[in-house]
Amino acid sequence: MRLVYLESPYAGDTHEEIAENVRYARACMADCLRRGEAPFASHLLYTQPGVLRDEVKEERKLGMSAGFKWSRMAPVSVFYVDRGFSDGMIQGMEVAQAHGRYVEMRKLKGWK
């Protein structure tokens, strides 16, 4: 199993948009697992209740910094882009490129 760092949108303007982004990220994680990969999606882990609040700027920055540190453990960053390319994903791309990590763009079949 190869390690992959999973990038997909998280933040949203409404609770519904965030919930849809979480649903999408979970589907992306399942896609990685079906491909025989071991994905890590820090935006799903660090935003759980009682951990960090994404809507609080300092906490979002802390979570992103921790996630980007973990991303160095994987030789590949996979970006799922059916729901767009968020500001956080842009930063993730910059970090991946700065560390010479391979970047792969993906879409989920049948995702609307």
For each feature predicted by the language model, list its residue ranges:
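Catalytic phosphate/metal-binding cores of nucleic-acid and nucleotide-processing enzymes, i.e., regions
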Residues: 1-112
